[in-house]
Regions:
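Tandem repeat scaffolds
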Residues: 1-179
Length: 179
């Protein structure tokens, strides 16, 4: 798909495999029951879009960004979220995650202060050098998910399981854990 501008549109039950979205700008769009496998965002922007019951696997990006996107009941595999911050990194690529399943995701140097991951499944993923102050991971399945040099002060990990924390490199003051 090349050089498209779409605003306020709804896309349903679409499947893209190996597609490159070049110069595309999606604003306030809804993607429902869509699948994106091995796709690439190249010089593209997603702004305030919603993804409902979608699957996104092996997303690659070049000079692209996402701003304030919402994901609900989605499966998100092998995504490097920092690559979606674009230059400047002033806007968060993710506004919310609700009832999502993430595997092999990487969050690097992101500000996720007070972010609500609660109830999500985040497996075999990595948070590196992130600000997770007051983030909520309550009841998350975090199987083999690692936290490296993160600021996790006041984060909530009650009833979360499977995570690995770099206790010497992470700030953990007042974080809440279940024993």
């Amino acid at each position: 798909m090349r050089a498209e501008y779409r605003e306020g549109e709804r896309f349903e039950r679409l499947t893209f495999t190996g597609e490159t979205f070049y110069g595309c700008d999606f604003s306030d769009c809804v993607f429902a029951d869509c699948t994106f496998e091995d796709c690439k965002l190249d010089h593209s922007v997603l702004t305030e879009c919603q993804f409902l019951r979608c699957t996104v696997t092996n997303l690659k990006t070049t000079m692209s960004r996402a701003k304030f996107t919402d994901f609900e009941n989605c499966t998100l595999n092998n995504i490097d979220w920092m690559s979606l911050q674009g230059d400047g990194a002033f806007a968060d690529p993710i506004e919310s995650l609700r009832d999502c399943r993430l595997k092999y995701n990487t969050f690097t140097e992101m500000n996720l202060t007070k972010f609500k991951f609660a109830g999500s499944v985040i497996q075999r993923s990595m948070f590196a050098k992130c600000n997770l102050v007051s983030a909520d991971f309550e009841k998350c399945d975090l199987l083999d998910t690692e936290f490296f040099q993160c600021d996790m002060r006041k984060a909530n990990f009650k009833e979360a399981s499977g995570y690995k924390v770099d206790i010497f490199g992470c700030k953990l003051q007042d974080a809440k854990y279940s024993l």
